[in-house]
Each structure stands twice: as C-alpha cells, then as structure tokens.
Amino acid sequence: MKVDLYTLQENDKNENNAIVVDHISKEFRIPHERKITIYKHIAGLIRGGSYSYEVFNALRDISFTVKHGETFGIIGPNGSGKSTLLKILAGVFYPDAGFVQVNGKIAPFLELGVGFQSDLTAKENIYLYGAIMGLTRSEITSKYDEILNFAELKRFENMRLKNFSSGMALRLAFSTAIQTDPDILLVDEVLSVGDESFQRKCSDKINEIRKAGKTIILVSHDLVTIQELCSRCLLIQNGHIVTCGETNMVVEQYLKLSTR
C-alpha cells in the first residue's frame, strides 16, 4: 500500500513543540525456533551454530510533531505499532533509527509494569512512581489521598499489587499518573479501564487536563472519543504512517481503510 508520509520541516524541530518524532524506525527479532531450556539452547548452538530470526518491522520512518497544549490522537488497527510508538515516546523502548525530542515532563499511562512493582503495596507504588516522576516525598503525600480516592482504592492501600485485579491495578496507575502534574500525558486505551462509571470519570479528567493546557497523546479504538478530544490525529497501519492531520479527515480515511 502506498503511504502518505508526513515530512518534518526544519522549523518543526524547535521547543515550540512538546514532541518531535523524526524518522524513527523500530524492529524486533522473532526466533524461528523456540528453545525451552538453556541446555537445549547451548546444544542447538553446538550442533547447528546460530539460529535464524524473522525481523518484524514494528515502525518504519515515522515523523510527526505535537504542539504544546495539543491533544493528539493515534489510531490504527490492532498490531499497527501504536503501543510501540507510545513506549518509544515514554523511553521504554529506543528507536533503531531516527530520534525523538521531548520538551517537558512525561507521565505515561501505558500498562501495568511501567513504573509499578507487583511486590509492593499500592501505597509504596504511589511513592515510587511519584519519585520516578521527580516529585518530593511531601509533594506525593499532598496528593496521596486524592490518588486513592480517584482510583476508588482507599481500603486497599496496603495490599500488594500482585493481589489486585488487572482493573484495580490500572485504575491505580492512571490515578497516579494524572496527579504527578506532567507537562505531557501519554494514554493508551484509557477507556478500557474499569467499569463504565470509572471510564467516564477518566474521560472527564482527560478533558480537564486538556483544558488546563497540558499536552496529551491519546491512543484509542474509540473514534468518537478521539474526535471529541483531539484536534489532530495520526493514522498508522503495519508500522507506516498512512496520514496525519485534522482529526475528522484522518478518522474518515481510517473508516475507508477498515471497510476494504
């Protein structure tokens, strides 16, 4: 499929933008043969030398900018590279080519495991994540009750995360991320968190953060939410940019691709 690549101009690469993504690519190696034990792995090397790998190109030559105060959407089919892209923005992965420039403090809400430890309690994780985000202990303490109340987890504050349901853990992660006062919030499928009431509360909070002039990068399959919140949008498929621009135009193109 022919793709319409968005090309950065030189004046895009300045601090007027919250994020600049310049020609990044990311690939993963997938082994053709799985070795279950170290012994089998070593035996295989002795018998046959090296193993063969399939190279999976998760992202290819991705470029775009996000302005300060903008709510920017990323859409595309499952497996298109959306979550990989957010992890690169968050610093979880590094691109194999290109570069990312971030102007501001990022708070990622991607998945449990980014900044949270399953063997620690909810309380310990709140303080750990806050410290990672650069908050002092007194700053975290001042936000502590609000974090637990928003997550609706006050009575579970001394429970270890490994005993939480996935929904409880994600509620805690989202509630903590939004209270660290980030300049840039990365959100992956927030509307999958919790029940319908909590999803609406998350959506309202994102809208509140947006109106406060913060930068938000939002990945979602909920196109209505993308259209409500995002001024611009990026559509990616099979690791490539299809188009980037005004949200309604990009969503319309995505719907056309989905019906082919």
Language-model features, listed with the residues they occupy:
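Pre-NBD coupling/linker segments of ABC/ABC-like ATPases
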Residues: M1-A58, T247-R260
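Conserved ABC ATPase "signature" C-loop
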Residues: N238-G239, Y254
